[in-house]
């Protein structure tokens, strides 16, 4: 990501600026979006207790309103980063592990080096923090995501500024702290992603008898990932920073 944003900062912005508007229509009818995917998600919960837990998050007086607010979602993708002092840039829009190809090392094993990002169909000009939120909520278990959140923005800014220095460019005009502050609002908007992606993985999958218990364990893991996302989103919603969007 640092290399990608270095290339953007080094190229003539006329190449991309004004050519990839945000598809605002994606954020219409969020009430129907939340209701439809959560209804399907509930079919994977094995007990009334788990259903009650998720109901408490998705119908929370603050969090429940924010994830259904079209105006809040539009603010996040079009303006929140500017208010935080982060310039508008190109955003992949669907950056998660299934859309990343990694290089192989000399032994043919998968390395940590990225070969390419795939699936640019919703590339847009907006808040670069959206790519962090999509990547972390959709690709990581709760413990890994939470650990990554403690250092990922510092690491990104350090890598990006190193890339820029190598080509004689000035550092970016924002800090890791600004990215992290913007991330809280973006994270709330991404709450539903671990919930709606699970039915996409399992709804059409038929398990053999040998696979049944394996898939059950995978479903449990996805549920836990969604639960941890809900816990953190509620913490951000309860901070009071976004209360103006509750009216």
Language model: regions and residue ranges:
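A generic secondary-structure signal for well-formed alpha-helical elements
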Residues: 1-12, 156, 160, 164
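All-alpha amphipathic helical-bundle segments outside canonical DNA-binding/catalytic cores
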Residues: 168-189, 221
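Short, flexible/disordered secondary-structure transition segments
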Residues: 11-16, 146-147, 163-171
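Active-site activation/catalytic loop segments of kinase-like enzymes and analogous catalytic loops
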Residues: 122-166, 190-211
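Catalytic activation segment of kinase domains across protein kinase-like and atypical kinase folds
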Residues: 89, 96-138
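ATP-dependent phospho-/nucleotidyl transfer catalytic cores
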Residues: 3-92, 102-111, 218-222, 226-233, ...
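Long, cytosolic, alpha-helical-rich C-terminal regions that act as interaction/scaffolding modules
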Residues: 184-246
